[in-house]
């Protein structure tokens, strides 16, 4: 029987930055200030988890956004537009990243429980290595540590490709995909896990897919969020998630269930 020996965590929206607001705010500013195009929160969030330059391309490719661009500039967007917007995105993101490194409630306790079981903690992200030079130390100062980090810069392609997971497995000496759980809060996270053939687990509360700040979430009764949570669960399951958990605190029990299922 192959028990789970490695958990690969996403960063923003899963481990830190409740609601995944650091990149959201930067994307909104870039489209508004750089190109004069207002995009919705939903449009900005939909491609979350991708390498950030790919995220910009994905938003520009949305029919409504593409139509606005063509109406404003009388042409299609091109690589130069993407490069200019990405430069502006980095400026906005780097200015605020340090403020979005607080661990999401339950993460520190859950990671401690996994480590007690001898489980290694790897990580993947849509952030670049330079961005993680801010995020990782900020999170570590608040108690969150991983055993390994892989950024899109280190592999042939970022999410939803499986390469960052595979590199984590090599770095952590985990020989089988059956021994790995990928945990994330975006559709790109789910697909990354599915494409790697590992166990793919989605987290709802605090996620980009839910798109709610911690303050807003705590200001309303839990039952008022059930409809939105149901929508998020359905999207994650449709993307191929093996399990969708309400919070990260449910992860140890989920891993136990996987181990027992494998034994059966």
Curated annotation (Swiss-Prot):
For this protein, the record's InterPro entries field holds: HAD-like_hydrolase_sf, HAD-like_sf, HAD_sf, PGP-like_dom2, Phosphonoacetald_hydro
What do we know about how this protein assembles, alone or with others? Answer: Homodimer.
Active site annotated at which positions? 10, 52
Q: What is this protein called?
A: Phosphonoacetaldehyde hydrolase
Cofactor details (free text): Binds 1 Mg(2+) ion per subunit.
Q: Name a GO CC annotation attached to this entry.
A: cytosol
Biological process per Gene Ontology, one example term: DNA repair
- Enzyme Commission number, as recorded: 3.11.1.1
Which NCBIfam families does the record match to this protein? phosphonatase
Biological function: Involved in phosphonate degradation.
Catalytic class of the enzyme: hydrolase
UniProt keyword list = Hydrolase, Magnesium, Metal-binding, Schiff base
Cite the SUPFAM superfamilies for this sequence.
HAD-like
Q: Which cofactor does it need?
A: Mg(2+)
